[in-house]
Amino acid sequence: MQTSVIGFPRIGTLRELKFASEKYFRKEIEAEELQQIAETLRKTHWSIQKEAGIDYISSNDFSFYDMTLDTAVLLNIIPKRYKELELSGLDTYFAMARGYQGASGDVKALAMKKWFNTNYHYIVPEVEDDTVIQLSGNKLVDEYAEAKALGIETKPVVIGAYTMLRLCRFTGKKPALDYVEDIISAYQNLVKKCEENQIAWVQFDEPALVWDMEAVSYTHLRAHETLMN
């Protein structure tokens, strides 16, 4: 029998991530120190799973704020008002999560919703008419490589294409159907990148399959089947 976990709590035994993030928001530490604390947490969590004998250890399950937001950034789903702030990648991410008021501008955070009737709230990705959904980030591969350098083989975890489309809010005139081909192409490129980096397993989470199907959802699901094939 082989064992796997779908993901690992990211906050830390002593809530290290929470406290470090709050220090960063108060400008008490630099981004480099926050990233170092995050790296230490990932190493600890992978090591715990390895020592417990887990066969399929997860990576890319770490997040500074929310995995849905992580996936949105991975797919270049970043509204213009946040890009126009011209902040660092990390600060743009936090602006989407928390809002931003400073020298670069004043924007509110993206909306939040309950994650499938749980008490967890996710950041709702916002797709504009001119949003180009494409693979635009290396977090998944980078964290796999980080674990590999420690001698730990992992399976990256990522929210799947079908669920991402169902979770997105479309703010323009274009419906979700107009983005099906682009999101499938982005995920195909993600799979190719995984193959190029000798990643044997990838876990695509599709919790939206528990929802009732709408007419548009059947098209999404067929597109998802195309990706899987």
Where are these regions (language model features)?
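Domain-level signal for soluble alpha/beta catalytic cores
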Residues: 1-222
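A short, hydrophobic C-terminal helix/tail in secreted or cell-surface proteins
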Residues: 223-229
